[in-house]
Amino acid sequence: MAASPVLATTSHPIGHEAAVVTDADLDRHYAVKLAGKLNDEMAWVGQQFTGEEDFVVCLSEADVAEVNAALTAFQDTGLKPGYLSPETFKLPKLGPKLRLLSQRIHEQEGFIVLRGLQPWRYRRLENTIVFTGIASYIGNRRGVQCADGPVMTHIFDYSTEVEEKEKLNDGYLGHANRTSYLPFHTDDGHIISLYCLQAADIGGRTLLASSHAIYNHLLETRPDVIETLKEEWIWDSFIPEKPSFIRPLLLEQDGKLICNYRIRPFLGTPGYPRNAALGPLPAHQEEALNTVAEIAEKLSLKFEFKTGDIQFLNNLSILHAREEFHCAKGDTTRRHLLRLVQMDDELAWRLPPGLSKDMDKMFQHDLEEEKFIWSPEPLPYVIGQ
C-alpha cells in the first residue's frame, strides 16, 4: 500500500488569532550532526524480520497466573490505579523479564509486542490495572495526554459518529479514532504503550519504521532532505495560550538520533488547518514530509495487532502508522485500544532542552492526581497529533 499523501495547506478559520512564534525553547543547536551511516540495532528494516517470533514475546500460563495474582493483590489494597508500580503490582518472575524488554525498547530494536492476555476475561477496571501494572515495568512514569487530562486514554472506532463526537468535544477527532489510514508520525512522550482490547475485523495492521533506517536511506539517496529536516521548522501548537514554536524534525542528543515527525502541525487537517499567520509551509519542506512518509512505508515492518496484545514502542526512534480497517456494527466488535504514554527514569534518553521542556510537563504530577478514563471517549487532539 502506498503511503497516503499529506494534506493540503489552508488558512485558519476566521476569528483565530495570529500565533506568535516564540524562540524561548529553540532546539536549533540540537539539529542532527551525525556523520555517516548509523549501524546500531535501531537501524532495522522490516524485511529483516523473518517472523513474528522476532518481536512478539508470548506470555506463558505461569506468566498470566502471576499477572492475575498481582491483580488480586492490588485490588485488595484499595489503592487507586495511579499507585500502580512494580512495588504494588508484584511480578517476581515476569517482572525481571519485562525490565529486559524495556532495555530492548530503549537500546535495541525499539519496540516489542507482548502476547497472551485475554482481555474478555477481565472487567473494565481490571483491564486497566493489568495493563498499567505490566507497563510500569517498562516505564515507571506515566504522562498526561492533554492539559490536565488523563494518563490513560481510549483509541476507539468513532468513524460512524465523527460529527457528533467533534461537536461534543469541541475539537478535532484524530485519525486514530477513525477507520481510515493513519499516516506515519511520532507522538509526545518517550514510550507509547497500547493494549488491544478488541482488534479490527478486517485490516488495521500496525506499521513501524525505524527513523535510523530512514536516515540511512536518505543519506544514500536524498541527503538534501536530511538538510531540510535539520532546518528550523515552524510548528503550529493549535493551542491559543501556547505560542507556536521552532524546532528541527531531526535532532541529536548524546550521539542519539531523535526523530520528531508529524504532519498536522505543518499542513493542518480539514476543519483544523494550520494557522495562516504562520505562513504557508515552504515547498521543499512539504516535499521532505512526503519523502519521509514514502521511505517509512518502504522500510516498514507490518504486522497484525491482535486482541490481547500489548505493544510498546520507543517514540523517539520509531515512526508508526496504521492501515485502514473495517469493523462489524456494534460496540462489542469495534476496534478498541487503551493507551499510555510513559518514560523510564533509569533508561530514558536525554532530550534537547526545548523537547525536554515540553515532554517533562507530561510527567510532572502527583500519583494521587492521575486520571484514568473508564469508558471510551475521544481525547481532544490539541498538540499536533
Swiss-Prot record:
Coiled coil, from the record: none
One protein family per Pfam: TauD
Biological pathway: Mycotoxin biosynthesis
Listed EC numbers: 1.-.-.-
Protein's UniProt keywords contain Oxidoreductase: yes
Annotated keywords: Oxidoreductase
GO molecular function annotations of the record: oxidoreductase activity
Protein's UniProt keywords contain Oxidoreductase: yes
Chain's role: Taurine hydroxylase-like protein; part of the satratoxin SC3 cluster involved in the biosynthesis of satratoxins, trichothecene mycotoxins that are associated with human food poisonings. Satratoxins are suggested to be made by products of multiple gene clusters (SC1, SC2 and SC3) that encode 21 proteins in all, including polyketide synthases, acetyltransferases, and other enzymes expected to modify the trichothecene skeleton. SC1 encodes 10 proteins, SAT1 to SAT10.
Additional information: Trichothecenes are sesquiterpenoid toxins that act by inhibiting protein biosynthesis.
Protein name: Taurine hydroxylase-like protein SAT17
Organism: Stachybotrys chartarum (strain CBS 109288 / IBT 7711)
Taxon lineage: Eukaryota, Fungi, Dikarya, Ascomycota, Pezizomycotina
Gene: SAT17
